[in-house]
């Protein structure tokens, strides 16, 4: 497999590196360690500042030395874990430089920390991590911990949800880790205010019918996914929740002390949605564990 790891020397990036080290990658796996150097935001802050401020060269040289050291610090534990490592120092804003590098290198997985810091431009701020997730064409792991001992899989039966399921099922680094398959029924209840009693009664009847149908549908989807994992020899169980999808997914991982949420980047829309882009984004913002966002590829994506 090919893993792209973005670092910046922050504790979050260190956890991301340690998470990569902790997983059992297949033989021949390669990790590309990158950092992004963008001095422009720190050096040019307004029209009154000269085009090339005094000390700009020294400032850039210092930043270059620091990020080079950060990259080399990440190399040693990865190589000690038996991984082949290559490195590069990217130029440009991290939110663009990292996805652009991923498009050229074509990793099976991009790994970033959830927050970052740096002397020049923060390489892995929450907003930057979000941008990497938005622009990457392959799965992105946003690391908040340094290990994975349990997985929560968001399931709604959508193509993106099935891509997430297939990844968990097929990727050897995730083999042997217990899985909780969670679906969320999200049907908006009617408001009584401003509705005539007879209309409200009809709306409630429709709501009851829809939520009953959704419970049955999601229950079947969850059961089928659990059966698929169990048939492959995996430990898996299902859980059906009701409410706001993002909120319930975050609560589910908290209630079960999960280490990783795996979620499709897009899912069903409408009243029965669960894994929409907005849901994945909200989970990224609020989950306290690592989040693996799986894209729906234009073509099948197979780890090398």
Where are these regions (language model features)?
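Short alpha-helical
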Residues: 11, 93-96, 119, 127, ...
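Hydrophobic alpha-helical membrane-association signature
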Residues: 16, 70, 160, 164, ...
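Gly/Ser-rich helix-loop-strand patches that form or flank binding pockets
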Residues: 2, 17, 22, 26, ...
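Structural beta-alpha unit
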Residues: 12, 22, 38-41, 54-61, ...
